[in-house]
């Protein structure tokens, strides 16, 4: 019996998709080719973020022969727009059932074949998250490359963030981390690794391949008003939230004597 059908799900592979009709079929096939040889129970969760093309229809065509393939559709999507990556990831984490979640974009620029190496690195290091790093091999235009470098400088300055490529969506993490991230706020997907570290989780980086977009168009704005200014404001917001966070862990108090009292502890 195929690994994806036996036992509790270990790995969820999750990708948000907004108008990716030309990529979703190949995406599913590439994920299957990458994960099946790992011999672990898995599922694929695609988040349709308000697509106005045939993205959802093409996913549905694939589903009858693939019990491991699931699709969740975002609600309350603005007309002809998506809710954005942060919201889509937020919905995806709540739909995923695996102990671990591999995240990637649906545009095929992330290579699902990297997931196996990420799993091995997580096992070897004991890390809670493996963050992909495309900085050595980005297949983007000059504007986006320069924007990433500038963003990295500001993140290091304001957040002491040493992650080289926090904008790379290809990452592997424990699902519990995803459920604690404030992804219901726009723009927070850019700060997943640094936020995870702030929450006390360990993050390691792994160089990954980055492929040119094969079909469709980028969903990111390139102008200063679409990315630079909102990105700086998001940085300031994250810095403010970090300073305001307080521990919420608590231990229930009982009427039993404390351990040190029973053992004749300090008087």
Kindly label every feature range from the protein language model:
Residues 1-33, 40:
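N-proximal low-complexity "stem/linker" segments adjacent to membrane-targeting elements
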Residues 3, 40, 58, 124, ...:
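Terminal low-complexity segments of carbohydrate-biosynthetic enzymes
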Residues 22-26, 53-62:
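Acidic helix N-cap motif at the loop->helix transition within catalytic regions
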Residues 42, 56-95:
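Conserved donor nucleotide-binding strand/loop of the catalytic core
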Residues 48-57, 108:
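A conserved acidic beta->alpha catalytic loop
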Residues 79-89, 93, 109, 113, ...:
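Conserved catalytic loops of nucleotide-sugar-dependent glycosyltransferases that act on lipid-linked
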Residues 101:
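Short aromatic/hydrophobic "clamp" motif used to bind/position activated sugar donors
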Residues 116-142:
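Conserved donor NDP-sugar-binding/catalytic core segment of glycosyltransferases
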